[in-house]
């Protein structure tokens, strides 16, 4: 089988290059554990973000944000706030990103061709790639030098709309040859949107990911080493 060659790779994070459990079992709980402190004693940056919710009552604000997290709502204001909170966890060694080893190697090997697109804020994405777990989680490595750029729902739009991928293709100057961009994700709706915008796609199947009803619609891989 002849492997296809691509100019660049657009990578999803959760369920693609990182276990889907990391977000719900590590990142979300860490955020919620610190939510009361954030609301009661916010930094200037956090206060600016909190004010965007337009909720003055602290209890009501807490309940609103808590519900967004528990229901995994892709709210752009929430994503901004989470990035600020997770920074403290990463920098204090409380959070380390469990990127799959095949993904670490792929990103390093294709360092001049890697882009990231996630619902999480660009700030949160950069933190995740700065503090990647290695050596059984005792140390971290920084993958940021291997990544050209990052996109999120604030900069590019939601991941299930083709217009978002159209915008990304224009940003990375591949509007004329979009089939040379390979988008990897575990979410068929995202793949459909990317495909509609002219990008090539691969469905990534990882342990713990939600079952895909028709996984024959897209070419699937179980490791980035297959590319």
UniProtKB/Swiss-Prot annotation:
GO terms for molecular function: acireductone synthase activity; magnesium ion binding. It is an enzyme of class 3 (hydrolase). It is found in: Cytoplasm; Nucleus. Its EC number is 3.1.3.77. Its cofactor is Mg(2+). It catalyses: 5-methylsulfanyl-2,3-dioxopentyl phosphate + H2O = 1,2-dihydroxy-5-(methylsulfanyl)pent-1-en-3-one + phosphate. It comes from the Eukaryota. Substrate binds at residues 118-119, 159. Bifunctional enzyme that catalyzes the enolization of 2,3-diketo-5-methylthiopentyl-1-phosphate (DK-MTP-1-P) into the intermediate 2-hydroxy-3-keto-5-methylthiopentenyl-1-phosphate (HK-MTPenyl-1-P), which is then dephosphorylated to form the acireductone 1,2-dihydroxy-3-keto-5-methylthiopentene (DHK-MTPene). NCBIfam families: enolase-ppase. PANTHER family: ENOLASE-PHOSPHATASE E1. This is Enolase-phosphatase E1. The lineage of its organism: Eukaryota, Fungi, Dikarya, Ascomycota, Saccharomycotina.
């Amino acid at each position: 089988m002849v492997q296809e060659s691509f100019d660049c790779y657009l990578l999803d994070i959760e369920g693609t290059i990182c276990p889907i459990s990391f977000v719900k079992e590590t990142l979300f709980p860490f955020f919620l554990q610190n939510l009361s402190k954030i609301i009661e004693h916010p930094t200037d940056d956090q206060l600016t973000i909190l004010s965007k919710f337009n909720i003055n009552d602290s209890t009501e604000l807490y309940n609103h944000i808590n519900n967004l997290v528990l229901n995994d709502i892709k709210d752009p204001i929430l994503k901004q706030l989470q990035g600020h909170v997770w920074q403290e966890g990463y920098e204090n060694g409380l959070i380390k990103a469990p990127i799959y080893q095949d993904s670490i190697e792929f990103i390093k090997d294709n360092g001049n061709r890697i882009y990231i697109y996630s619902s999480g804020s660009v700030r949160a994405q950069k933190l995740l790639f700065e503090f990647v777990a290695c050596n059984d989680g005792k140390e971290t490595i920084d993958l940021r030098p291997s990544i050209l750029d990052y996109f999120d729902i604030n900069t590019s739009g939601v991941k299930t709309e083709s217009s978002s991928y159209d915008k990304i293709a224009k940003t990375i100057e591949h509007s004329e040859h979009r089939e040379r961009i390979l988008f990897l994700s575990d979410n068929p709706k995202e793949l459909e949107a990317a495909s509609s915008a002219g990008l090539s796609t691969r469905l990534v199947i990882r342990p713990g990911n939600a079952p895909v009803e028709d996984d024959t619609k897209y070419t699937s891989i179980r490791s980035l080493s297959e590319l």
